[in-house]
Amino acid sequence: IAACRVCLVEVVGKEQLVTSCNNKVQEGLEILTNSPRVRVARKQNVQLILSQHDFKCATCVRSGNCTLQTLSNDLNIIDLPFKERVEHAPWDKNFPLIRDTEKCIKCMRCIQVCDKVQGLGIWDVTSTGSRTTVNVKGNRKITDADCALCGQCITHCPVGALRERDDTEKVWDAIADEKKTVVVQIAPAVRTAWGEAMGMKREDATVGKILDAWKRMGADYVFDTSFSADLTIMEE
């Protein structure tokens, strides 16, 4: 894509630095990936990205698992020599997919995966110059864009600009409300893989433990949605 310019490398014999992500390796090339020129250019590019990024890491869903955060630490960035300017755009917070324009770093990965892999073309570049950002193609609302909610753009976003809507607090509020009956549905993917996140062996991560955990938290009923999940997979 060569949008972020963070992957710059130095090719011996060439005057200009080149992006490694979209240049093919050829026989006989001598490539320097960590030369003084590369380090200076890479640091400046990351600083430019940060100057247009809302880096409230403590409240970001990607904190601790953020490519930009890792790069900033690796390049020893402790201040910004550029004026900070963060763009804001409204978004429907009720939609399952949440986009935070203030955190977008214009890497264009969401555009590429949605267009070339999923074939949907939901995202596109909007505005120009320093106001350039990514938004729904054609200035449409996301609810009118036929988004399949596949989640690929969230997976490929290196920061917290794209994420799933978090309804955790709504769940706790429902459990605390004695007038409500809380019904939990567990998909087969969760049933079979939840133990990995807990560092448990497969034979120890039983369905019964999921049931027990939800009942202890306050759920009234717990069901497996394998049938409806199969239908969803067929539709996708």
Kindly label every feature range from the protein language model.
Residues 1-34, 38, 164-236:
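Iron-sulfur-associated redox domains of electron-transfer enzymes in respiratory
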Residues 5-149, 155, 162-163, 167-174, ...:
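Fe-S ferredoxin-like electron-transfer domains
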